[in-house]
Amino acid sequence: MKRLALASVIALVVVMALPPLQVVAGESLPKVEWICVSTETTPSHHTVVDVAKLAEGVAQRTGGRFSIRVALEGELGFKRDAYVRAIQRNQVQMSQFDPGWLTAQIPHLGVFNLTFLQDGTLDQLMKIEQATRDMSLAAFAKLNVFPIAWYSLTTQELISRDPIPDFTDLRGMKVRIWRELDAKLIERMKGVPIYLPGSEVYSAMQRGVVSAVNTGTPAMTDRSLQEVGKYLYRFGGPPASHYLVVNLQAFNALPNEYKRALFLEGWSLTDRGRETVERVDGEAVAKMKRAGVQELKIPSEQRAKLIKLAAPLWDEWAKQSAENRQALEAAKKALGL
């Protein structure tokens, strides 16, 4: 793992030492067209907007000769469960990889999803990413991909049609979830977890298939959940996060000038993501309040009980593999636990 990380750094230093690409010189370079798949279904979602800015930046840095099309989930005829296969086959050259659904291929990424292990702040999430980065780089290489950016989304909250008097006893309430560990926690809270893709949550909530939805606040407003939900609970679940990865063969085939453009824009995306997440959360909450949604906090005594309910799930998860155990130990050390 250390050799992989060192090799990546050496390659990056070589690429970054190149002089900036001039548009005139770029006329002799090949035209390259890539496709990037997003995990979102709406073009206005902040991660789609931010990745589109990366694509624009790459095009500008290469005189328009390296273009990246950002496709929404489902736009190409397949959804996120096929993203790994699509990028491995070079059907797409770039993809958002979310640890929330990538645990089937890289189980140790589940450390990002351990509810209440961290407090939901970006600083703590970054500590977990840094502590497990060598493990992740090695795992990505086995999938034939390489990350050029990493960024967080907002914390995972709950929007409900009905008030929730006691979070330690949901009394059979059906809650939409999308991560396995969240499902286990909802069960411990005496609720019923229901797996649903984001594109189906509005109609499911409208028809009563679920009474509450677990997701980030921007996703709530992107899917108009303020029309069917009336109570926003600051659950503070682990934020989703994205690695933006590229196909290794497609990347290696690029001229060094294009690689440099990707790295520079990848760094910009990582920095931009930090600023975006706070802004979009505030905007989404304001929009929901205008629609009559009440923003509520979970009482401190209930939250303390929820942490006790969640903690055994961390150890249960860690026992599944040596990699999981290593990731949890690294995360705890980084967080001072």
Show where each model-derived region lies.
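N-terminal secretory/targeting leader peptides
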Residues: 25-123, 131-337
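Short, low-complexity disordered leader/linker segments with a strong preference
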Residues: 1-33
